[in-house]
Amino acid sequence: MTIIAEKALYGVSVPVVGTYANTMLKLDITKHCEIPRGAKIVAANHPSTTDPFFVAQMLHQQSFIMINDVLFQVPMLGAYLRKSGHISVKEGHGQEAIDAALKHLAAGHTIVIFPEGIISPTEGGSHQAKTGVARLALESGAPVIPVGIGLIRENIYHVSSTVR
């Protein structure tokens, strides 16, 4: 997808994600350092499905998220993710995802990765981290910005819906 289309979709997404984050999440962001511009790898834990929204809201700059391929199979969402330049991570095809992320990093972009690869256990703790962050950092030389997400489940508003 062209850079112009990615930037246009990002421009449309910012107010949508911001509205969602500010409406559905109680965010308390504490920065211990300024987030630099340019190529970087943002590595965050993954306690809930809302984490990409949280990280996007925190960064205030375009980023490309490494996302499980399952979400790319959802009809409208998948099309949006592809056209926005996000990176599909398909089981057994990790090198393809790494290569796509390395291209973004070489272009000076920000990559967001959830090292666990899946949502953390609901009872706390985390899954074993995969090697993607280290591989990207070693191959690209880009700095890694660690992000810790402390989730208080009561601070997430739940909206029930049924699709018929």
Predicted features along the sequence, with ranges:
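Catalytic-site beta-strand/loop segments enriched in glycine and acidic/polar residues
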Residues: 104-133
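A transmembrane-helix-recognition feature enriched in membrane-embedded lipid enzymes
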Residues: 1-30, 54, 61, 75-84
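Catalytic core of membrane glycerolipid acyltransferases/transacylases, capturing the structured
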Residues: 36-93
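Hydrophobic/aromatic ligand-binding patch that stacks against planar heteroaromatic rings
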Residues: 55, 80, 103, 135-139
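Short, basic, glycine/proline-bearing loop/turn elements
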Residues: 16-17, 83-88, 116-121
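Helix-adjacent hinge/juxtasegments
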Residues: 86-110
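A cross-family acyltransferase "interaction/gating" segment
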Residues: 31, 123-164
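Residue-level preference for the first positions of well-ordered beta-strands
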Residues: 39-41, 110-114, 145
